[in-house]
C-alpha cells in the first residue's frame, strides 16, 4: 500500500504542470500573460530564449512565416539549444487560413501538460490564434476574455477593420467550432 501511494505521488509529481514565472519575461516584445501556462508575445530576442526556458516555458510555437525577414534565421536551433521544444506554423498575415488554426489547435491540445509560448512578430497572429483556441477549444469566450487576449491589437474594432482577413478568419473558425 505504501508503495502504491509513493508511486502515485511520483507519477503526479513528474506529470504536474508548473507555472510560467512572468517576472523575468516582462521585457519580451508585446508579451501577454494569458494564463499560468500560456503566454503570447512578439518575437523574442535570441538571448530571451534562455530566459523563457528558465521561467518555465517548455514549448515554443512560432507563427511567423518561413523565410520572413521579421523572424530569426534558425529559430528552431535557438529554441532547442535553450532546452525547449519547437513547433512552427507558417501563418501568412495577408491570408490566414483555418487549416493553420486547426494545426495550432492540434499542437495545443497535444501539449496541454506543457507551459507554452505562442509568438509571431508583434503578437497579432499569436494572440488571435490563442483567442480562437480559448473560444472554441476551452469554451472561454466572454467579451472581456476576447479583449484581454487580443489586447496587443490595440483598438480591436479599428484593427479588425484595417485587417479584415483576420475578422473573417475569426468568424469562420468560431462558426465551425461553436
Q: PLM ranges: what are they?
A:
Residues 4-13:
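Sec-dependent N-terminal signal peptides
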Residues 123:
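Substrate/cofactor-recognition hotspot
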Residues 119:
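Short, surface-exposed ligand- or partner-binding patches at beta-edge/loop junctions that are enriched
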Residues 17-116, 129-178:
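Cys-dependent protein tyrosine phosphatase-like superfamily
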Residues 126:
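Short active-site segment of divalent metal-dependent hydrolases/proteases
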Amino acid at each position: 500500500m505504501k508503495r502504491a501511494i509513493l508511486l502515485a505521488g511520483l507519477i503526479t509529481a513528474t506529470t504536474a504542470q508548473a507555472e510560467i514565472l512572468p517576472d523575468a519575461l516582462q521585457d519580451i516584445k508585446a508579451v501577454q500573460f494569458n494564463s499560468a501556462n500560456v503566454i503570447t508575445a512578439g518575437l523574442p530576442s535570441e538571448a530571451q530564449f534562455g530566459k523563457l526556458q528558465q521561467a518555465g516555458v517548455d514549448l515554443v510555437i512560432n507563427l511567423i512565416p518561413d523565410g520572413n525577414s521579421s523572424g530569426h534565421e534558425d529559430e528552431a536551433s535557438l529554441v532547442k539549444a535553450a532546452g525547449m521544444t519547437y513547433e512552427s506554423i507558417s501563418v501568412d498575415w495577408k491570408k490566414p487560413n483555418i487549416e493553420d488554426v486547426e494545426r495550432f489547435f492540434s499542437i495545443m491540445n497535444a501539449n496541454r501538460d506543457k507551459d507554452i509560448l505562442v509568438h509571431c512578430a508583434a503578437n497579432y497572429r499569436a494572440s488571435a490564434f490563442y483567442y480562437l483556441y480559448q473560444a472554441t477549444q476551452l469554451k472561454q469566450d466572454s467579451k472581456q476574455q476576447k479583449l484581454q487576449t487580443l489586447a496587443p491589437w490595440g483598438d480591436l474594432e479599428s484593427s479588425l477593420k484595417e485587417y479584415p482577413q483576420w475578422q473573417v478568419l475569426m468568424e469562420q473558425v468560431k462558426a465551425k467550432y461553436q
